[in-house]
Amino acid sequence: MNAQAILVLDFGSQYSQLIARRIREIGVYTKVIPYYTPLKEIKNMNISGIILSGSPASVYSKEAPTLDMEIFNLKIPVLGICYGMQIIVKLFGGLVSKDSKQEYGRSEIFLKDEKSLLFSELPNKFQIIMSHGDSIEKIPDNFKQLAFTKNCIASISNETQKIYGLQFHPEVTHSEFGDQILKNFVFKICQAQINWSLEGNLETIVKKIKLKVGSKKVILGLSGGTDSLVCALLIKKAINENLICVFVNTGLLRKNENKKILELKHQYDLNIKYIDASTKFLNRLKNISDPEEKRKIIGKEFVDVFEKITLEDQNIEYLAQGTIYSDVIESKSKDSSSSKIKSHHNVGGLPDKMSLKLLEPLNEFFKDEIIQIGINLGIKKESLYRHPFPGPGLAIRIIGEVTQEKINILQEADNILTEELFINDLYYQIRQAFVVLLPVKSVGVMGDQRTYEYTAVIRCVNTQDFMTAEWTELPYSFLKKVSSRIINEVRGINRVCYDISSKPPSTIEWE
């Protein structure tokens, strides 16, 4: 896309793409590139503003990512967020302290300069999300303080050069007025024009798929989740019958998943090939407890299945995946300055060498954008708003070794949770809900008998984009009913817990 863009220089923050998402939400094209992109390339880009992302690094580290000072001479407005502000301070001769108080989570900010365009139309105090270990000790010459918290300098600016810094994260949904701050930077400071729409970008993606694939065929692993279904219909729109959807029964699926996925064949006129590989997957996972190893094994087994299919049809050249932005972000490795959270099956679980070329048409979109694309493609509510299900399936919701017994137990427990969510009209009010089976047994009493069985954990979260999430405050009466049903109806579980962890610091899935 050649439209003028807001450029996000990524220093390795898990939220870099989220910054881009927030700005795209207000209608402006946004591009994310690595911080080490040569200045010559940046000069050749059509950009109206630059945002410096956060980073897990400290500016004091010898290997800390840095920036070419010449970028500030391009006469383009710059906004540094968290680490981005700290690198500005360091480069301009200020002082960043690594011994000051760390701040993580909610904090109250107070405006010192209410006339700044960055905080235009905002109250003089509000709640924001902090996530930093270092903080500003001394502001550089020609900069001024715009805002503060009880513990640190929260914002600075050099109005003459249009350089701004925020110690907090306006891009996360729990920062009050974060969207307005980004709007102020984009429209009032950068003078950017509205030039982005999901519909227009959708047409571009279809054209790109046609151009890339040509007359070749594409296979796609259909999981029944929103991402893979949207991906399938998008590719079908581009290449029609040259898309072959493959439903691999891994034996790690939700209860009755086979039936639901095969129904998609008739609902959306998809060419679906069914393969039962459950025995093979379970045998390969025997005695494996490490979550990363489980993901890698499952990824390799999927590719093996797909590559065998290509032997039957030499015209198949591409493997399509419903990889989305958050998958890519969480799978970034440390060599790109981002702390790796976990490898996603879609991006980190595939072997380095495979004969198929990878096609990922959704890897620049966030979850809410995927849903909007699905609406545009005519996907029904019950398919579009199904709760996400990971590629490795129940293998990463069974903590520790995967066995057939544990799969059966978890399928039944998870199905009870889903049933009760529908019965109580709660399913569509929650973005993701599932049960985790722990490798922990505890003593219980059922009737007059002593039991020693597994512990199940219910996990329910609400989120807009799956980059941050809050645990869902469900009614006690509902939790009591679900717990009672699981313990009484599922042989093998005698204790049920409820996970009240938010993201961050926890991830949504346990593995």
Curated annotation (Swiss-Prot):
A GO cellular component entry from the record: cytosol
Active site: 82 (nucleophile), 169, 171
Binding site for ATP: 223-229
Keywords, ordered alphabetically: ATP-binding, Glutamine amidotransferase, GMP biosynthesis, Ligase, Nucleotide-binding, Plasmid, Purine biosynthesis
Pfam hit, one: NAD_synthase
Enzyme Commission code: 6.3.5.2
The keyword Hydrolase is annotated on this UniProt entry: no
Annotated catalysed reactions: XMP + L-glutamine + ATP + H2O = GMP + L-glutamate + AMP + diphosphate + 2 H(+)
GO molecular function annotation: ATP binding; GMP synthase activity
Domain GMPS ATP-PPase: residue ranges: 196-386
Pathway: Purine metabolism; GMP biosynthesis; GMP from XMP (L-Gln route): step 1/1
Domain Glutamine amidotransferase type-1: 5-195
Quaternary structure and interacting proteins, as annotated: Homodimer.
Function noted in UniProt: Catalyzes the synthesis of GMP from XMP.
Alphabetical list of HAMAP family matching this protein: GMP_synthase (MF_00344)
NCBIfam families: guaA_Cterm (TIGR00884), guaA_Nterm (TIGR00888), PRK00074.1 (NF000848)
Protein name: GMP synthase [glutamine-hydrolyzing]
